[in-house]
Amino acid sequence: MVTLIDTISERQVRPRHPEKAHRPDAISPPKPDWIRVRAPTSRGYANTRNIVKENGLVTVCEEAGCPNIGECWDKKHATFMIMGDTCTRACAFCNVRTGLPDGLDPDEPAHVALAVQKLGLAHVVITSVDRDDLADGGAAHFAATIAAIRESCPTTTIEILTPDFLRKEGALEVVVAAKPDVFNHNLETVPSRYQSVRPGARYFHSVRLLQRVKEIDPTIFTKSGIMVGLGEERHEVLQVMDDLRSADVDFLTIGQYLQPTLKHHAVMRYVTPEEFDGYERIAFTKGFLMVSASPLTRSSHHAGEDFARLKAAREAKLQSAG
């Protein structure tokens, strides 16, 4: 008689960041008081979580470990992350799972649209993992999701936060043709930190991507953001502002980098609220229509309220010019 031993049932769970497993722990300084947030416990948070789970959706709020999830979900605000939960890049700052993703779910656009409808969102933010494995980087899936939301929720304004579509010819044009209200693509950090923080991306490609959106459709608002506390110098942050204004970007967000795990890039320092206030004032003087800069600022935080302010700022600028 032969006894078969089942080794599959005890298979270890695949690590979330296998490419970082061999790295020594990176120790960050303790968080200051101004970084602390309350744990999410409200009924509104639970209701939003239930709608997300019932529709089998992924949110960047959960995957990236956003500190604002309790506040946003309590208000029924969620940022949907399409095309799966696994990214083909391995950025040093990001908590999203890395590896080879599954195929696209053709029903996902409809599921996202249904969740938007159930939540009664006036403004929705759609982001995605990087999908370097796809010929178009997922551009058609973005467009399909926008179209599905337009059909089921015609009054909902749509903001997208996209990957860089590096070496994906024609992908950007497909997404812009779907006419999102806001096109966001984050630079994430200053150029000198790209090799250690965002090695799979190219700084000036990202700047050019944002500039190209405006060239294709000047009516679309453009937006970008960076994290600070990664070892950048103040003058480098100001240069990023100038680069984004040269690309006619409307909205800038600046927030504090927070280390997801000890295997991720360390926090080099915590930027004070007063320094964030200074960055915000300078950015407005450089011509941005909208600026949000604070320790807990994230791309999608208060996105609906900020979109209303962004529209008002453009209208005021046009009236003053006329």
From Swiss-Prot:
Disulfide bonds: none annotated. Residues 1-31 are annotated as: Disordered. Belongs to the radical SAM superfamily. Lipoyl synthase family. Binds 2 [4Fe-4S] clusters per subunit. One cluster is coordinated with 3 cysteines and an exchangeable S-adenosyl-L-methionine. It catalyses: [[Fe-S] cluster scaffold protein carrying a second [4Fe-4S](2+) cluster] + N(6)-octanoyl-L-lysyl-[protein] + 2 oxidized [2Fe-2S]-[ferredoxin] + 2 S-adenosyl-L-methionine + 4 H(+) = [[Fe-S] cluster scaffold protein] + N(6)-[(R)-dihydrolipoyl]-L-lysyl-[protein] + 4 Fe(3+) + 2 hydrogen sulfide + 2 5'-deoxyadenosine + 2 L-methionine + 2 reduced [2Fe-2S]-[ferredoxin]. This is Lipoyl synthase. The gene is lipA. It is found in: Cytoplasm. [4Fe-4S] cluster 2 binds at C87, C91, C94. The keyword Iron-sulfur applies. Keywords: 4Fe-4S, Cytoplasm, Iron, Iron-sulfur, Metal-binding, S-adenosyl-L-methionine, Transferase.
